[in-house]
Curated annotation (Swiss-Prot):
The lineage of its organism: Eukaryota, Metazoa, Ecdysozoa, Arthropoda, Hexapoda. The chain crosses the membrane at residues 17-37, 61-81, 113-133. Essential component of the TIM23 complex, a complex that mediates the translocation of transit peptide-containing proteins across the mitochondrial inner membrane. Coiled coil: none annotated. It comes from Drosophila melanogaster (Fruit fly). GO terms for cellular component: mitochondrial inner membrane; TIM23 mitochondrial import inner membrane translocase complex. This is Probable mitochondrial import inner membrane translocase subunit Tim17 1. It comes from the Eukaryota. It is found in: Mitochondrion inner membrane. Disulfide bonds: none annotated. One of its GO terms (biological process) is protein insertion into mitochondrial inner membrane.
């Protein structure tokens, strides 16, 4: 599964680090703006300035944390691509687990293991959803043979002659063998 829209590996680390920083800074900025707005004294002016102060104080830190996660994840992912000589979902799952473990290493072994488990499970979930979506969406781009197209056309004509709606036949409300 090659991703042709991505940079090659050494540059991918920098690209992912920057993208993660931007995502963390914007998302963290929005979250901090809401938090600062809610925690400020009453009055619209105070609330707006409180929200802006919270954004200035914390959004860069959140963006930096996201950037560290993105750079670590990409470095491990590129290392796995180099050593395994293939790019598949297992690289992302292993990278997520390893990144979670590395970033939680200062807090102790149990926290490190639980963060690695959460990182691996989260990336497995993301990769699994991506595989399922690509599997089902690929079927809509499948080429239909002329014989199959003719069979579908005949079935549609029979449905129209019998007065059966296409939705009823599609969703199993009627036995298609009776047509």
């Amino acid at each position: 599964m090659a991703e042709y829209g991505r940079e090659p590996c050494p540059f991918r680390i920098v690209e992912d680090c920057g993208g993660a920083f931007a995502m963390g800074a914007l998302g963290g900025g929005a979250f901090q703006a809401i938090k600062g707005f809610r925690n400020a004294p009453s009055g619209l002016g105070y609330r707006l300035s409180g929200g802006l102060a919270a954004v200035r104080a914390r959004s860069g830190l959140v963006g930096g944390n996201f950037a560290v996660w993105g750079a670590t994840f990409s470095a491990i992912d590129c290392s796995l691509v180099y050593f395994r000589k293939k790019e598949d979902p297992w690289n992302a799952i292993i990278s997520g687990a390893t990144t979670g473990g590395i970033l939680a290493a200062r807090t102790g072994l149990t926290s490190m293991l639980s963060s690695a488990l959460v990182g691996g499970a989260l990336l497995a979930l993301i990769e699994g959803v991506g595989i399922v979506v690509s599997h089902y969406s690929a079927d809509s781009y499948r080429q239909v043979s002329p014989v199959e197209r003719q069979q579908r056309y005949k079935q549609e004509l029979l449905r129209q002659q019998k007065g059966v709606s296409p939705l009823a036949a599609t969703y199993g409300e009627i036995d298609s063998s009776a047509l």
